Amino acid sequence: MSENEGWCTIESDPGVFTELITKIGVKDIQVEELYTLDSSEYDRLKPVLGLIFLFKWEKEEENRTISDNENIFFANQVIQNACATQAILSVLLNSEGIELGEELSNFKSFVGDFPPMMKGEAIGNSELIKETHNSFTVQDPFIFSKKKNRKPSDAFHFISFIPFQGKVYELDGLKKGPYCLGDCTPDNWLEIATPFIQKRMEKYSQGEIRFNLMAVIKNRQTTLQEKILTLEKKKNDLEIKLSELNSGSGGDNKEESGGATPTTKEDLNFMINVVNNDIEEANNEILMEQEKFRNWKDENIRRKHNFTPLILNLIKGLAEKDNLQPLIQKAKDQISQKQQQHK
C-alpha cells in the first residue's frame, strides 16, 4: 500500500459521509449509522444500497475463494487514508438507479476495464475524489515530526457489503477481489449479509469495541415524500368511493369488490383516518430529517474549523488581565482534591 500522499483521515460519521457523497456529485443519497441488525431497522431505512463496516484492522489469513464476476466494480486500496471514501465508492459504483453525476459517471466508464490495482491508482489520482475527501481536513497549526521510535497508531479499515446481480458481495480493498456471500433478491440481501457481519462483530467485540456499521440509503426526505404521494393517492381513491356511497351511486356491499377494499361508510372513514395519520407521521419524519441535516451541516463546519487561534487569544487575554494564573491554580487545586478523595 502506498503512503497517504496528501490524503487526510476523515471521521467515520454519517453526516461526514453524506456530505462527501453529495460533494462528489451523487444525488439523493445519505448515510445512516446502524445500532442494531434487526430487520425492523433495515425496514425503516429501505431501500438500502450497501453497508459499510469499520473495524480495527489486524492481519489475518484468508482462505475464501475470490469471485470471478468481472462486472462488479472492485478496486484495491492503494492509499491508506482513502479507505473510507473507497468503501463509499464501492457501494455507489455498484448501485443501480442512482444519479452518480457527470464526473463520477465518466470516472466509472473510464476505469471500467482496469484491473483492481489500477482502479485503486485511479481513485488516488482523481482530483474530484481527492479534493472532496480532503475538504474534511481539520486544520492543525502544529506540525509533529515523525520519530522512528514513535508507537504506530491503530489502523482502522472499512469494507463494504452490497447486492449485485442476484448475489451478496463483501468488498475489501486489501484483498485480491470480491467475496461472494450467497444468492439473494433485492428484498432479502440484508438477511444474507447479516450473519457475516455479526460474525465479524463477535470476533472484534472480544477485545475491541471500536467498530461501527453504516447503511448507504436513498435520501430519506425523498423516500418519505414519495410515500406521501402514494398515501395521498390512496386517500383520494377512498374519498371518491365514500362520495359515491354518500350520493347513492356506489354499492354498499363488500361482496361487490370481493372484500379487496372497504366498501361501507364506516370502514372507509376509518381507513381515511388511518391514511391521514400515516401522512402526518411521514411529514413529521421529514421535519426530523431536515433538522438532522441542519445539525450535520453545523457539525461538519465545526469539524473543519481550526479553533486554536481563538483559544490562544483567549489565553493571551486572560494573561494580560492577570486572570490566567488564578485559573491555573484553581484547576490544580481541584485536581489535588480529586486525588485526595480517591486515596
UniProtKB/Swiss-Prot annotation:
The UniProt record lists the keyword Transmembrane: no
Keywords: Cytoplasm, Hydrolase, Nucleus, Protease, Proteasome, Thiol protease, Ubl conjugation pathway
Reaction(s) the record says it catalyses: Thiol-dependent hydrolysis of ester, thioester, amide, peptide and isopeptide bonds formed by the C-terminal Gly of ubiquitin (a 76-residue protein attached to proteins as an intracellular targeting signal)
InterPro entries xref list: Papain-like_cys_pep_sf, Peptidase_C12_UCH, Peptidase_C12_UCH_sf, Ubiquitinyl_hydrolase_UCH37, UCH_C
EC number(s) on file: 3.4.19.12
Keyword set includes Glycoprotein: no
Molecular-function GO term, any one: cysteine-type deubiquitinase activity
Enzyme class: hydrolase
Positions annotated as active site in the UniProt record: 83, 157
Subunit structure: Component of the 19S (PA700) regulatory complex of the 26S proteasome.
Family: Belongs to the peptidase C12 family.
The name this protein goes by in its record: Ubiquitin carboxyl-terminal hydrolase isozyme L5
